[in-house]
Amino acid sequence: MNELSKIEQAIEDLRNGKLIIVADDADREAEGDLVGLSEFVTPEKVNFMTKYGRGLICVPITEERALELDLHAMATNNTDTYGTQFTVSVDYYTNSTGISTADRADTIRALAEPLSKAADFKRPGHMFPLIAKNAGVLERRGHTEAAVDLARLSNSIPSAYICEILNDDGTMARYPALETLAKDWDLTLITVEDLVQYREKEIAIEN
């Protein structure tokens, strides 16, 4: 399967509610994230992320959505190496403690729900929204933008949930470990570079 076919497979998997793995560039973080569409989140999938991903679960959203929910940047002066745009953390108002997989799934789903309002979220909380650049991976080659781009390509609400993948010893999982994990978990593995090429080809066809 070539790289562009892998993107098509990833989109199909996401539409069917599956998780996928997205790896970024080797000269960037060189990390892999589990990615799912917020529309199809379940407590079981969140539990899979916490058990096997082991990283921080975040919720990529659009800048427009962040404004709608009054989600301001966590830091006014962002000094993160790669400019990851965290907002203040939140919990959905129906949550108990906010940390159970059911509570976190509810918050992820609510962040994507068009009818949700800013007042529906308690701040701070246990979920971390991330604001994606408007042009997606063509503007910033991060997992945040890749996740939102994939949601759009899947004709879903432009919101996803992601989690970095760590090895058993707590170090970051990189190639070839990511390939092994994708095979073990029966998940499609793509790269941000694959997605950039897919989007560039899509734009070229449109023009």
UniProtKB/Swiss-Prot annotation:
Mg(2+) 1 binds at E29. Disulfide bonds: none annotated. The keyword Chloroplast does not apply. Mg(2+) 2 binds at E29, H143. GO terms for biological process: riboflavin biosynthetic process. Its EC number is 4.1.99.12. Signal peptide: none annotated. The keyword ATP-binding does not apply. Keywords: Lyase, Magnesium, Manganese, Metal-binding, Riboflavin biosynthesis. Binds 2 divalent metal cations per subunit. Magnesium or manganese. D-ribulose 5-phosphate binds at R28, E29, D33, R140, R141, G142, H143, T144, E164. It holds the Pfam family DHBP_synthase. One of its GO terms (cellular component) is cytosol. Its cofactor is Mg(2+); Mn(2+). Gene3D superfamilies: DHBP synthase. Pathway: Cofactor biosynthesis; riboflavin biosynthesis; 2-hydroxy-3-oxobutyl phosphate from D-ribulose 5-phosphate: step 1/1. One of its GO terms (molecular function) is 3,4-dihydroxy-2-butanone-4-phosphate synthase activity. The record marks H126, E164 as: Essential for catalytic activity. Belongs to the DHBP synthase family. Homodimer. NCBIfam families: ribB. This is 3,4-dihydroxy-2-butanone 4-phosphate synthase.
